[in-house]
Amino acid sequence: MASSNLLLEVQFLHIPSLSQKQANPLSCRKFSSLDWKQEIGLKKDVFFRCHGLLSSVCIDNVNDHAERSSEFHHYGVGTNLRARVKPMKQFGLSSDGPITENDEETNNEILHNLCSNGKLTDACKLVEVMARHNQVPHFPSCSNLVRGLARIDQLDKAMCILRVMVMSGGVPDTITYNMIIGNLCKKGHIRTALVLLEDMSLSGSPPDVITYNTVIRCMFDYGNAEQAIRFWKDQLQNGCPPFMITYTVLVELVCRYCGSARAIEVLEDMAVEGCYPDIVTYNSLVNYNCRRGNLEEVASVIQHILSHGLELNTVTYNTLLHSLCSHEYWDEVEEILNIMYQTSYCPTVITYNILINGLCKARLLSRAIDFFYQMLEQKCLPDIVTYNTVLGAMSKEGMVDDAIELLGLLKNTCCPPGLITYNSVIDGLAKKGLMKKALELYHQMLDAGIFPDDITRRSLIYGFCRANLVEEAGQVLKETSNRGNGIRGSTYRLVIQGLCKKKEIEMAIEVVEIMLTGGCKPDETIYTAIVKGVEEMGMGSEAVQLQKKLKQWKLLKEV
């Protein structure tokens, strides 16, 4: 549609099956949903006097002849109801037909069955017929119909049925309204959504947190930050409860789109309206700025928190520590920790994990281990994340003996080692060429019922190749293939080239076969390495013959 105003209009056209004599003379009039505010307060008898206006609502312009020509009793209507429905020929719901002879209860039972069977177009037609003949449609069925139409993106029909429901005295629930408002916001029809939001309160179904959050997010998505701020301020002035979740969402979005300074201004403005921020609201600002490294903005927010008599909590401290560790501001980290010890918010296991992880990433393993022991002194039990971080860092730094010792202690704690734990230590041992210890740990892992993954096997294979134990690497590849596990092509290449260098051509060819059966296509370098290995074994004629075969099979290019 050309604009959001056009969306607000519902065209009332002649129903295709009606003759000119049957059609209501007012049926071509347009009726805007902007007029809802005047209509919602009308009594039901006034609504019934308006039936001429609703006489020929064209709910569906889609070519759905099959659906329109269906009979009501085909949609699961009970035997008693069929008896009450007058006998009829094949007819469409776009015509009143004998339906006018049905009472309200009968038509509502038909409406319920149509909605239950997903016949939304027929249900829309029936609601229109009932409205034209002063029959009040079943409100729960209308709500379900509106939701169904909203799900299939038929907003014009959904809003039309919603209007009929409201003018009949029904009160749609908040979920129904929210579905329509959500779809309107997705399409960028903010004005229409705001009109519908205002109508919610007038109809006795006030907006909730989801309603407000949806509208505010939509405004920001379309670059209307100031409109969103004014909107929430107006809602507070009109008596809307100061929903803290909505307030937090608003402030975080203002911070994201307009900066911290504007967000703090909004905090001050909303406080005048009786909406006061809590530490959760402030934490959203701290978190946003920390993630972007805006430490000056963070300092400004912290100062604002303290100046208003609020205390930082554990979430605030942990967020600050995570940011400071990532920037390697270790003096500031120590300062924050000292403050935490002096308050009621002592460091938790999450706090220590942040510190240990940051120090390990900065390759300050000794300080990380100091914090690990400090953690134990404070009676703060490490979890598996703590152990995995320390063991991973030890293995990378070559402290494999210490890692094995810590791993042994871990078995007797409430945090038994897992796959990640074993992989870290096995990889460290393999990189140092300590394959005997790596294999021992590998078998311990299997005995504990922990199955290796591609990382485990790749660490072993690379370790064997570095230690010039290519045959053992080939055996691991065979075991992997027998279990149906995948291996990277680079791993196969490393083993094949290592076998060729050691003139283990038969085993190299066997690994190639494993590679092919595993669905991994070798490249030309692998075949070249095999030919070269055969030649170096003193079998020149065999190498030439093999090369010809490979070229014939188009596995090697002609030079």
UniProtKB/Swiss-Prot annotation:
It holds the Pfam family PPR_1. InterPro entries: Pentatricopeptide_rpt, TPR-like_helical_dom_sf. PPR repeats lie at residues 103-137, 138-172, 173-207, 208-242, 243-277, 278-312, 313-347, 348-382, 383-417, 418-452, 453-487, 488-522, 523-557. The keyword Aminoacyl-tRNA synthetase does not apply. Gene3D superfamilies: Tetratricopeptide repeat domain. The keyword Repeat applies. Keywords: Repeat. It comes from the Eukaryota. Belongs to the PPR family. P subfamily. PANTHER family: OS03G0856100 PROTEIN, TETRATRICOPEPTIDE-LIKE HELICAL DOMAIN SUPERFAMILY. This is Pentatricopeptide repeat-containing protein At1g08610.
